Swiss-Prot record:
Assembly behavior: Homodimer. UreD, UreF and UreG form a complex that acts as a GTP-hydrolysis-dependent molecular chaperone, activating the urease apoprotein by helping to assemble the nickel containing metallocenter of UreC. The UreE protein probably delivers the nickel.
UniProt-annotated location(s): Cytoplasm
Free-text function comment from the UniProt entry: Facilitates the functional incorporation of the urease nickel metallocenter. This process requires GTP hydrolysis, probably effectuated by UreG.
Keywords for this protein: Chaperone, Cytoplasm, GTP-binding, Nickel insertion, Nucleotide-binding
UniProt xrefs under Gene3D superfamilies: P-loop containing nucleotide triphosphate hydrolases
The keyword Cytoplasm is assigned to this record: yes
Organism listed in the record: Ruegeria pomeroyi (strain ATCC 700808 / DSM 15171 / DSS-3)
Gene Ontology biological-process entries: urea catabolic process
Gene: ureG
Keyword set includes Nucleotide-binding: yes
Name of the molecule in the record: Urease accessory protein UreG
Transmembrane segments: none
Amino acid sequence: MSKMNGPLRVGIGGPVGAGKTTLTAALSEALRDSHSIGVITNDIYTREDAEALMRLQILPQDRIIGVETGGCPHTAIREDASINLAAVAEMERRHPGIEIILIESGGDNLSATFSPELADVTLYVIDVAAGEEIPRKGGPAITKSDILIINKTDLAPHVGASLEVMERDAGRMRCGRPFVFSSLRNRDGVAEIVKLLAEIAGLEIRSDLQVANLA
């Protein structure tokens, strides 16, 4: 459902290659049948992520807007979110009554956060292959995001990462905030993420939600 003052805006952040676009695609796929949904992607100099989503054909092309941020990608989601707010307004113009807009940031570091003016709920994706120490390094994105997604769990045995250590450290750093282990390319963990998002944002989702494997 949309908010009283417009659609629910979900910020999706994380380092380059962590799985943001895969998460955006999976959430779009899971929510498109029950909600009017759109996507805004941020890239520094291209619209590669938007084009990747269009190729997947999960949403019609007019429901995907690519933003070229230039410079530091965190600026466009935090200090000066005007370019993204303009994209939100354009999405609302195209689709009056749109209920959910997913806003995918450009790749950034652990200090990246979304401006409250831009995002109502924030999801942050990290990659097991980047090292089991990532959760304990902290930073606002790790500690304050509404949902932390620890992605690519299937790679843990190959990179020597301990999921038990990551679970312990994530629990300690997040002080009760939820986190999910996932293998997003296989759609493992997506249903749990959708359920948590629904609880946090007050969304109604189908009890028979099925998430396909699009790997």
